[in-house]
């Protein structure tokens, strides 16, 4: 199939947005019905890209969006098959971030993963608000309840096992504008992103700190 051959060639020709850095990331990919359309395409694309760049036991794997997350191997001989299989993966109505961190650590320990092969970033890609995708939140302030104590405890758990905890990046791909900020979790290593664009995709993977906003005339501006 010529179309599949072209897609495979284009996929293999993509640049390494992580650059010379040893940093890699693993994705929690929301494939629920509400993601249909551009959000699902963004989620699957980033999930496949990061899985391809991962090392050790995380190579060619992604994590399901579920209260009981699982590490799934990407199946398929062609790019089209991989996209289809990931798009049809299991999903839930929310995701338990603590369970995701525990899953990554358990996988690393069970496979005796080298510290340098541990993903440095955890991307959670969904169309839900951050609060809606968590198992615990304040219903009055609508702010996460997993603050510094949770993050500190999780970091210590990773440190005790000889690893560094991945930085958390929550990406809401349904929003109509793009924004990145780092003031949540009381200064802990956590980032919220909303919207999507090629510029945003590139900068997230490169770890660039910026804000891209949609102006009243509909154009986008990166600051």
Indicate where each model-derived feature is located:
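Acidic, glycine-rich A-domain
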Residues: 1-223
């Amino acid at each position: 199939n010529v179309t599949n051959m072209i897609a495979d060639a284009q996929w293999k020709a993509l640049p390494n947005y992580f650059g010379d850095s040893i940093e890699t990331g693993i994705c929690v990919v929301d494939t629920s019905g509400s993601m249909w359309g551009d959000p699902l395409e963004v989620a699957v694309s980033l999930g496949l890209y990061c899985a391809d760049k991962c090392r050790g036991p995380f190579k060619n794997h992604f994590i399901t969006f579920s209260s009981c997350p699982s590490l799934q191997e990407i199946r398929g001989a062609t790019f089209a098959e991989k996209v289809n299989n990931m798009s049809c993966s299991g999903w839930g109505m929310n995701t338990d971030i603590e369970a995701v961190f525990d899953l990554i650590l358990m996988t690393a320990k069970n496979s005796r993963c080298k510290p340098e092969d541990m993903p440095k970033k955890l991307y959670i890609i969904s169309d839900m608000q951050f609060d809606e995708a968590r198992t615990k939140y304040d219903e009055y302030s609508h702010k996460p309840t997993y603050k510094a104590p949770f993050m500190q405890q999780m970091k210590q758990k990773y440190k005790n096992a000889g690893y560094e905890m991945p930085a958390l990046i929550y990406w809401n791909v349904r929003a109509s504008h793009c924004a990145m900020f780092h003031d949540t979790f009381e200064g802990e290593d956590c980032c919220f992103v909303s919207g999507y664009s090629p510029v945003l995709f590139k900068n997230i993977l490169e770890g660039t700190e910026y804000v891209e906003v949609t102006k009243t005339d509909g154009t986008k501006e990166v600051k």
